[in-house]
Amino acid sequence: MGHLKSNRVALLIFAIVVCAPTVLPQNDAQQKDLPNFHQVSEKLYRGGQPTDAGLKRLVQQGVKTIVNLRDDDDHARVEGTTAVAAGLRYFNLPLSNFHKPSDEQIAQVLSLINAPENQPVFVHCKRGSDRTGTIIAVYRMEHDSWTADQAKQEAEHFGLGFWQVRMKDYISDYYRHKLAKSEKSAPESPPKHR
């Protein structure tokens, strides 16, 4: 029985190390410049609203593209101008912080993330938790074959609020639709011979 328990512990530790997103060390100034900043994969970073110093740090990090999920307002236009001047590609695709995103919005963001010419990509909203958490959750389900529960757990770890019921519902709905679609496209089993 003890051997079985130690195997479970070893498997759990392995899963945490392999599946956990990379957390890059940050001092207080870096945290202020790039709040809630984390590496999701070699091609994708996530976080909150970067300052001008944060944009410079993204360039140093090798990021090529910023996808801003916040409103298209003066702040976004200033960020876009600053990002482009720093040599970054910039896209502002506003998502509501209070409503479910549409499938079209999600597809548009994922297409930007997946385009090789844009990678690595930094996706952000204000805090890097709710809208960004939803996008990253869908990315995880699509690219890393995560379940909705795994994706929501990571999103909650990075701050997806308990009040964000619509965002969490979207993650669950997306997963259900993904499963239904994969079941429809799966080849039928040949009839069994008797």
Q: What residue ranges belong to the model's regions?
A:
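N-terminal secretory signal peptides that target proteins for export/translocation
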Residues: 1-6
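Cys-dependent protein tyrosine phosphatase-like superfamily
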Residues: 8, 14-122, 134-194
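Substrate/cofactor-recognition hotspot
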Residues: 128
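Conserved lysine of the Walker
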Residues: 131
